[in-house]
A protein has these predicted regions:
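Phosphate-binding glycine-rich loop
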Residues: 64-103
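N-terminal "arm"/small-domain region of PLP-dependent enzymes with the aminotransferase-like
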Residues: 1-56
Length: 151
């Protein structure tokens, strides 16, 4: 019988942020995926359709979506990846391409999930400096090594 080897991750717990602005109400936090515009009227109309069947899980392989994308952009259906948001795509890329000891270069003020999924895969996260809060290609190139797998 094979016993799984458990991994211990050195990850900081996510703490949903509260706004430091005390005197304002109805603050919209874009970093928490809140929308300033609310639900689209088109989405509301579709969801109000009584014929819409929401009692089943959606197609987890996104076959219809991938087929439409392949038709629209004239590309191979089997080379299209869909996910439940950018998180899932980042997770898939890290699981597919990273192993323990690999390096991932991310800008210092980038999306938190890049470093979380990299660490889960056992990779070392290397931060590149930004210049005036913009990604600097030259700073990224300085960090590239033989262990770099993802930038």
């Amino acid at each position: 019988m094979t016993i799984p080897k458990f991994k211990k991750y050195q990850l900081e717990a996510y703490r949903p942020g509260k706004s430091s602005i005390k005197k304002m109400r109805n603050i919209i936090k874009l970093s928490a995926n809140e929308s300033a515009l609310g639900v689209s009227p088109k989405v509301k109309k579709i969801l109000s359709n009584n014929k819409l069947d929401l009692s089943r899980y959606p197609d987890n392989k996104s076959k219809r979506l991938r087929l439409e994308i392949s038709k629209k952009f004239n590309c191979n259906f089997n080379r299209i990846i869909c996910g439940s948001g950018s998180d899932e795509i980042i997770q898939m890329v890290c699981q597919l391409f990273l192993k323990y000891g690999d390096e991932v270069i991310v800008p210092e003020y980038s999306f938190l999930m890049y470093r979380i999924y990299s660490k889960i895969a056992g990779a070392k996260v290397i931060f590149s400096k930004e210049k005036k809060f913009k990604i600097s290609v030259s700073e990224i190139i300085k960090k590239v090594s033989k262990k770099t797998k993802i930038v």
